[in-house]
Amino acid sequence: MNSIARRSAVSVAGLLVAGGVLAGAGTAAQAAPTESTLTVAPPPAPPAEDKRVLEHDYQRQPNGYYCAPAATRIALTTQGEAPSQKEVARKLGTTVDGTDSVDQTTRVLNEVTGGGYETTKISEETAKPEQVDKLRADVIEAVDAKRGVVANTIGTGVDTTGEPHPFPGGHYVSVVGYRDGGEEMKVADPYDPEQHYWMSDDKLGDWIAQRGYSS
């Protein structure tokens, strides 16, 4: 190959190489802005669990007949009131035979907090659907207003794990929260060793049946 042809070949090769580099750079330069300006929407966050539990001070009842004073006190602590169980028992008129009815817990809750509580009775042996609906609505309203609920129960209540809580002579518990739109309720039990458990609204309604609750 003569020198002129060799120089021409080198020049053409140089242009091809340069063109390839430039073309590559141009492709990268065009791709880079696309990558940097591409906005990818994050995956939607999973819905937050519909749950609300009030802050409260749990105390276990000291004997077999102080369930109402203990449950009432737990409810009072959701509103920043923390009297002793003995003081609450005196206000309730509690004796070794227990506390007469939920009317007393409603009265004392209103006396200490300034009002807002009402008594609801379920006189039947099992709660009717409309009574369960009212219980759910009352618990949601009370908890949203930062008021613990006191429930007077009798018989055996079964929590969401299937654990039975038998009180054939009657018992008092506090309801301090709800989840799943109120279909399950957080019970603070002043007698139970576990202290707290969840119970469905219909199971709690049946447990309250023949008694009542303060909300």
In which residue ranges do the predicted regions lie?
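Conserved active-site-adjacent core of cysteine acyl-enzyme catalytic domains
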Residues: 32, 87, 91-215
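Active-site-adjacent structural segments surrounding the nucleophilic cysteine of cysteine proteases
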Residues: 2-111, 157, 163-164, 181
